[in-house]
């Protein structure tokens, strides 16, 4: 038999969670990319520490859901058919950004793109491949994707700042992997701020608040 693998692009319903600015106009926008097996609403709740009335927060949810430890989680991609999955979520995030910018006044806002855990790789790829620019690329608790187009990343970072944030006792990512990522970034002449904290595989809320919410 002549078996063939083909692809078909189809419409898909995507879910996201949003926290609107109480003041009606946002001076800071956050695109928050969750980690493996998380859901958008749960991830957005991690940012309740952002009390600023003029911050608009949006957490998109990965397009693939699955059962995980008797709960439901979402994922951004797997190794299987990875290029199409990357293309799908870049297109999805482009459409989400288009919708948000049409519906809310973000003309003078600061744009923050934050990725946590698996969401770091998604955030980096969207930062490079996406149609929108961000003032800050904030990468929390993950190694850095080795297949990055560093030429394009350097070009994008001319108008942005990148933060590489990691715990010294991360139970998911070893210090060796963090150090390999830092070395990779330096070798490719990437300007970034390396920030470590005493802690596990978590979002350091105090650190994020001090950096971006004061």
Language-model-derived ranges and their functions:
Residues 163-166, 170:
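Short beta-strand/loop motif that positions the catalytic acidic residue
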Residues 163, 176-214:
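C-terminal catalytic histidine-bearing segment of alpha/beta-hydrolase fold enzymes
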Residues 132-144:
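A conserved short beta-strand
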Residues 43-46, 150, 174-184:
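Short alpha-helix in the alpha/beta-hydrolase fold that links the catalytic acid
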Residues 8-106:
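Serine-hydrolase catalytic machinery in alpha/beta-hydrolase-like enzymes
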Residues 45, 125-129:
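Active-site signature of alpha/beta-hydrolase-fold catalytic machinery across serine-
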Residues 105-115:
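Alpha/beta-hydrolase fold nucleophile elbow
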Residues 114-119, 123:
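Gly/Ala-rich beta-loop-alpha elbow adjacent to hydrolase catalytic centers
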């Amino acid at each position: 038999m002549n078996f063939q693998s083909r692809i078909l692009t189809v419409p898909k319903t995507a879910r996201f969670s949003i926290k609107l600015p109480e003041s009606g106009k946002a001076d800071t926008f956050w695109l928050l990319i969750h980690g493996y097996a998380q859901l958008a609403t749960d991830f957005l709740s991690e940012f309740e520490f952002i009390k600023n009335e003029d911050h608009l927060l949006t957490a998109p949810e990965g397009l693939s859901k699955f059962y995980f430890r008797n709960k439901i989680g979402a994922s951004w991609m797997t190794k299987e058919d990875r290029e199409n999955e990357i293309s799908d979520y870049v297109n999805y995030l482009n459409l989400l950004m288009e919708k948000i910018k049409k519906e809310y006044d973000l003309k003078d806002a600061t744009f923050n793109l934050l990725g946590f855990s698996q969401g770091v790789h998604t955030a980096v790829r969207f930062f490079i491949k996406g149609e929108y620019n961000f003032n800050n690329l904030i990468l929390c608790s993950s190694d850095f994707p080795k297949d990055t187009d560093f030429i394009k990343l350097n070009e994008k970072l001319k108008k942005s700042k990148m933060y590489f944030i990691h715990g010294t006792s991360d139970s998911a990512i070893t210090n060796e992997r963090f150090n390999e990522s830092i070395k990779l970034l330096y070798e490719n002449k990437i300007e970034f701020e390396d920030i470590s904290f005493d802690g596990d595989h978590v979002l350091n809320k105090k650190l994020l608040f001090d950096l971006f919410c004061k």
